[in-house]
């Protein structure tokens, strides 16, 4: 028993002593990976060492199995994530492959800016411009998959080696789409390549369709312009017809008439076919054609317009009137809108509500129009009687005026709207243009109804001259003629030469002033004899010599306001002169007009020298008149010969 126990103890102690050294323990624990080659210790063949070595291997296998069990769900999750990411990428590519409205508008604007020739000739430049507008589609899996990194858990790479990423660049075959740049790993299939190709084809087709649409829009714009021109040419007559109704002013206004009763005074709106110029002055509400507002007790019709839109006009387009221009007779016409301005009345200022001028189209053979002031217009019914009297006196223009009257009476029988359409400027102007009688005489003296007006002016002047010659009430014309005669003044005594010279200068000045001012003052130095009788001064009696000194002073004093200047006819004697002096005193103010400034320069000695005997002076004048035979023969036609007499 003792021997067996000792042997057991020795057997139990034996292996303990063998594995005691630390070098062997560290050596036995060295292999840590299953792939490393197994190293066997020489000389060790006991089962305990094999059991101990097998323990770490089992633990490592268990760990690997656990790791593989953990990696299985993670790989499935990664596959699901990849599938979702690929789907999202495909959706984004589809969205980006289809043009948005903003991109399409930008492309259309760029193409419209370029001309059609550049678009056809430079296709490459156009494609480049389009690709510059398109946004590049870039899909990188490294960016879209932030959770996936290169690791040893990849199914295709069991050894844990990383594979470098490669770039695949796919450009459309037409070069029209933007380049799509994406990164992928080796071994991964491209997601849905057929869909991408179809998307690229649809992109190119869409852009081609966009080009065609742009070209169609440009071509259609040109065709539209041509069609518009054709339509304007075709519808020109229709536009003119509309202008006759609208631009002529007929459709522009609403006519209101005020009741003449002072207790009423309401404004009533008239229908479109009523001419307000034909209405009487005592118009009242019961004369209104509108049944709803034909009594004074009915309230006034409401109107929502502004007061600034109201014009207190007496005529409307279509009113027949008589128009008068300066130097021409009254002529029948019709109120109508100006074809250039589109208005039929004008104001002197924008603050006025009463028109100052109306546009008139004259009746007659010639088509003429003009802007006539209000004070040169009359109603057609007012001047008919006066015109009949005028026709008796003037027969030269009766034919043309008769044609105009016939036309006015014909226009008076129809409504206002038809009147404007038939007798308006455009309709008559086109008719005269087709007949070769196109004469537009506006805003000038030539817009008179006929050429016979000049003859009328000449006849009026001749009639005036004849009336002035035959009419005894007009003595001014005679005096003007007397002033125009160049009669030489006569002097008195030895100073005849000096008086003659001074008289001539004064006569010229006075004549110029009297003609300029139309005054009838005769020249002062009318007393005396002609040059043929200037040498008979020595034969005159003594009292005439006393008048030598006062005569020179009286020449200046004769134009003063305090002196009287009277005209005496040559056939009258001394007694006739005395009787004619009071009657001619009424004409004294006319002779005071010229040279009124010289009145203050007359000295008082002139008044003293003028206190001579008037009777003696008149006797001397009678003797001179009796001796001058030549003067009687020259003035035998009966004209007055003025003699200046001076006195208080």
Curated annotation (Swiss-Prot):
It is found in: Nucleus; Chromosome. A zinc finger (CW-type) spans 250-304. It comes from the Eukaryota. The keyword Zinc applies. Changing residue 303 to E: Silghtly reduced histone H3K4me3 and non-methylated histone H3K4 binding. Zn(2+) binds at residues 259, 264, 285, 296. Testis. Gene3D superfamilies: 2.30.30.140, 3.30.40.100. Residues 1-103, 137-237, 436-648 are annotated as: Disordered. PROSITE patterns: PWWP, ZF_CW. GO terms for molecular function: histone H3K4me3 reader activity; histone reader activity; methylated histone binding; zinc ion binding. Keywords: Chromosome, Coiled coil, Differentiation, Metal-binding, Nucleus, Phosphoprotein, Spermatogenesis, Zinc, Zinc-finger. GO terms for biological process: cell differentiation; homologous chromosome pairing at meiosis; meiosis I; positive regulation of DNA recombination; positive regulation of double-strand break repair; spermatogenesis. It holds the Pfam family zf-CW. Residues 61-79, 88-97, 209-237, 453-471, 585-595 have a biased composition (Basic and acidic residues). Changing residue 300 to A: Reduced histone H3K4me3 binding but complete loss of non-methylated histone H3K4 binding. GO terms for cellular component: chromosome; nucleus. Residues 194-208, 505-516 have a biased composition (Basic residues). InterPro entries: PWWP_dom, ZCWPW1/ZCWPW2, Znf_CW. The CW-TYPE zinc finger mediates its binding to trimethylated histone H3K4me3. Dual histone methylation reader specific for PRDM9-catalyzed histone marks (H3K4me3 and H3K36me3). Facilitates the repair of PRDM9-induced meiotic double-strand breaks (DSBs). Essential for male fertility and spermatogenesis. Required for meiosis prophase I progression in male but not in female germ cells. This is Zinc finger CW-type PWWP domain protein 1. It comes from Homo sapiens (Human).
